[in-house]
Amino acid sequence: MKLASLNQGRDGVLIVVSRDLTRAVKVPQIAATLQAALDDWAIKRPHLEATYQRLNDGLEPDAFYFDQADCHSPLPRAFHWADGSAYVNHVELVRKARGAEMPESFWHDPLMYQGGADSFIPPHSPILMADEAWGIDLEAELAVITDDVPMGASAAEATGHIQLLMLVN
């Protein structure tokens, strides 16, 4: 199933996108935004999956041409953003570019930080910076969207809370 958010409103408008990325359909009868769908995922997911199947079968009368340039980030605002630097070769290159050695511990204890999640930039929008000399770090990342994970959950228990995977950056 492929989901996206149109760049309309503060939290976007949820759409279901066809497998071949050519068609999409708005789903306000299911959820207005991806966050609204996630808030009630156990109920919303089957309806979204059924819509995805109908869209791919050519049975959605309100389907429209899908243009990625019309999209916002899937979750324009998220409740939490924890970034784990698991791609150690990238961390090493970024640190090298600024003349810093990478600590040996990064090879077995990945760096994790809590980043800003209140306003992600749409994929085709310019990245505005006060000074371009600061440099812009752009890399491909994977986002793991979970439901409510209890504190102290083991890795195996946390796996059961994964709801979506997304490409980021």
Feature map (PLM): residue ranges:
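Active-site microenvironments in enzyme catalytic cores
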Residues: 1-8, 19, 35-37, 42-169
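Short N-terminal binding/cap micro-motifs at the start of the first secondary-structure element
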Residues: 11-16
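A short, surface-exposed interaction/processing loop segment used at functional sites
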Residues: 22-36
